[in-house]
Each structure stands twice: as C-alpha cells, then as structure tokens.
Amino acid sequence: MNLHEYQGKQLFAEYGLPVSKGYAVDTPEAAAEACDKIGGTEWVVKAQVHAGGRGKAGGVKLVRSKEDAKAFAQQWLGKRLVTYQTDANGQPVTKILVESCTDIAKELYLGAVVDRSSRRIVFMASTEGGVDIEKIAEETPEKILKATIDPLVGAQPFQGRELAFQLGLEGKQVAQFAKIFVGLAKLFQDHDLALLEVNPLVIKADGDLHCLDAKINIDANAMYRQPKLKTFHDPSQDDPREAHAAKFELNYVALEGNIGCMVNGAGLAMGTMDIVNLHGGKPANFLDVGGGATKERVTEAFKIILSDSNVAAVLVNIFGGIVRCDMIAEGIIGAVKEVGVKIPVVVRLEGNNAELGAKVLAESGLNIIAATSLTDAAQQVVKAAEGK
C-alpha cells in the first residue's frame, strides 16, 4: 500500500525528522488559508497522487500569493494528473499539499528497501538527488552508496556517519544525517515498510539537512498489524479492477497489452507473460487465481479481464495439482457461458487429469482452443489476438 507525500511526512515528523510545515487541503479556500497558517511570502503547492513525475506534469508549483495557491487548487482538485508513472488516464487529485518554501543549496538521495538476496533492509544514498534512482543505478551504479541493517541490533549511528562522510557532508551535517538515517530505519521497521524514499534529501542554504519529499510503500502482507496505517489508505488511487479482484482474493495487475492472462500461481503467471512476449504478444494483465481455481473465481477473473476493452484474446494457463484439470475445465466452460465471452479463449491444462480436461473443453462446443503445450498456447493466443 502506498502513502501520499503528506502522510509520509506526517510519519517523518512523528520520528523527529526535519520536514516542511504544511497542510493537506481539499478545497481552494483551504489552500489559501493554509498559506496564512504557514506564513511567509512563498509556498510550494503539490498535487497528491501515488505517482512520481508530478513536477514535469505541472503537479508541483511555487506560488507567491494566496490567490495563486487557490488557483492551483481549483486547477487540480477533482482532476486527473497524468505522469510518466501513470497510465493514460492518470490519477485523481483529491488533496493538495501546501507547504513552506525551502531554499535549496544541494540535493541528495536517501532510500531503503528490503533486499531479497541478503534478507536485510538496505539503505541507499547518493549525491545525485532529485532524479530517478533507477536511472542512476543503471548508468552510474558507483554513485549509489549502501548500508545494510542488521535486524538484531537495528541501524547504528556509525553507519549513518559513514554514509555522511561518503556523501561529502561536513560538521553538523554528519550528526544530522546520522539522526535522519537512524530515524528512517526505525520508521521502516516499526511500520513494516517495503520501500522508503527521501528524494530529494536537501542541504538548505543555512547548511541544515531537510526531508523535502516522502515516498512510502507498506508491505501489504503486514497490514493486519498496522491498523493506524490502514486508515491512510486512499481508495481513489487504486485501479478499480485491481480493487475488485482483491475482494475475490485474485491477484490482478493491469498492463497495456491486448492478451488477457489467467493463471494459477504467481511464478507460472510471470512465466506465461514472458512466453507471450517471446512470441510477439503483449499481455494485458497479470492475474493469479491462486490454488483454488473454482468456477466462481474463474468467472470473476473473466469479468475483470474482459472489463479491459483492449483485450482481444484470453490465455488460460492452469496447472492441476490438488484441483483436477477436468473440474477446472468445467469451471472454465461455466464461466465462459455465464460471462458470455465473445473473444477467442486459449486454454492450456497440465497436471492432474489434464487429458480429461482437454476432452471436456473439446466437447463443449464453445470458442475455446485447447493448447497442447505452453509454447503452443502462446502461439495460438498471439494469432487469435491478431485475428489470424
């Protein structure tokens, strides 16, 4: 689950980290009032969406009057912001963050993720702040500094000081960085985060460090023990299809292709998408129906896939283990009849009673193409999507 910038900064402040004074508002009038509360003559107004690239898309602006802040809120509230990280529809803007202006001397990067290979929280820092860390990692990986957190003792101040020295910080900045480093690590562990970024972490004109942005992603598997963070969830930022799928315990992620994919098992689903790509197709989604591919779940899966108007064909790839393939085939047939699927459906069944499942599909009289292998399934669905 992602948090908005203003929510992330709220957590930062609770851990004593330096953030700008600001208010999240949902009306133009409140934006003007926020300027009065903050004081000063310049403010930064930011559209709140779960996506990066807001500045280039016009979603972040420096304003020098309350009228300009109000006009910015009128421009964006209730609208959708399209950035390079969103789809063509963009994300709805329901909040505007109004905060004090910061005089920036230098921008740094500080972030943390769970590293699967070391099974540790790993902090990353760089002198290249304010840009995409992925681009830095690809083009100049030597500019990314790392510190691994021991889960038994947590982040240690000396690790923060080491990173600070490597970043070229001096004097009071070293102690400030160490405090921010330890605070962020504690925040990461306390709230079961999957990702945390301060981009940029800035050096102000007076030499002090300041957290100018906040990006936080919480591990969805740990939400049951984070009741406070559950209240931070903004459903307006969710893809409606993904939200609907979650109600039926279906793991769905919308993509931009034209071949719908329905698979049982996350690994098999990723492999299926890869082989579709290999044969010239473009998956329209990732969809894992899980171990229990019942008629009800398959039916809902078809409904979700077909809600995407770009889908020209569907590939169903099921491995029968505990659940028999003939039962799965009957579920697919029932779902196709109930939903009224008009586009080609290619089905590959493997495992328990696979031959019987293929026979059931062949005798159904429906527009279902039984594939003999995964390669055959990929080739068949690509042809079907192209109308061949």
Curated annotation (Swiss-Prot):
Residues annotated as binding substrate: N264, G321, I322, V323
Cofactor comment text: Binds 1 Mg(2+) ion per subunit.
Binding site for ATP: K46, G53, R54, G55, E99, T102, E107
Catalytic activity: succinate + ATP + CoA = succinyl-CoA + ADP + phosphate; GTP + succinate + CoA = succinyl-CoA + GDP + phosphate
Superkingdom assignment: Bacteria
Cofactor: Mg(2+)
GO biological process, one term: tricarboxylic acid cycle
GO CC terms, sorted: cytosol; succinate-CoA ligase complex
EC id: 6.2.1.5
Domain ATP-grasp: residue ranges: 9-244
GO molecular function, a single term: ATP binding
UniProt KW Magnesium keyword: yes
Keyword presence, rRNA processing: no
Pathway it works in: Carbohydrate metabolism; tricarboxylic acid cycle; succinate from succinyl-CoA (ligase route): step 1/1
Residues bound to Mg(2+): N199, D213
Pfam families, alphabetized: ATP-grasp_2, Ligase_CoA
Keywords: ATP-binding, Ligase, Magnesium, Metal-binding, Nucleotide-binding, Tricarboxylic acid cycle
Family, per entry: Belongs to the succinate/malate CoA ligase beta subunit family.
Function: Succinyl-CoA synthetase functions in the citric acid cycle (TCA), coupling the hydrolysis of succinyl-CoA to the synthesis of either ATP or GTP and thus represents the only step of substrate-level phosphorylation in the TCA. The beta subunit provides nucleotide specificity of the enzyme and binds the substrate succinate, while the binding sites for coenzyme A and phosphate are found in the alpha subunit.
Description of how the protein assembles with itself and partners: Heterotetramer of two alpha and two beta subunits.
Protein name: Succinate--CoA ligase [ADP-forming] subunit beta
Organism in which the protein naturally occurs: Pseudomonas fluorescens (strain SBW25)
Lineage: Bacteria, Pseudomonadati, Pseudomonadota, Gammaproteobacteria, Pseudomonadales
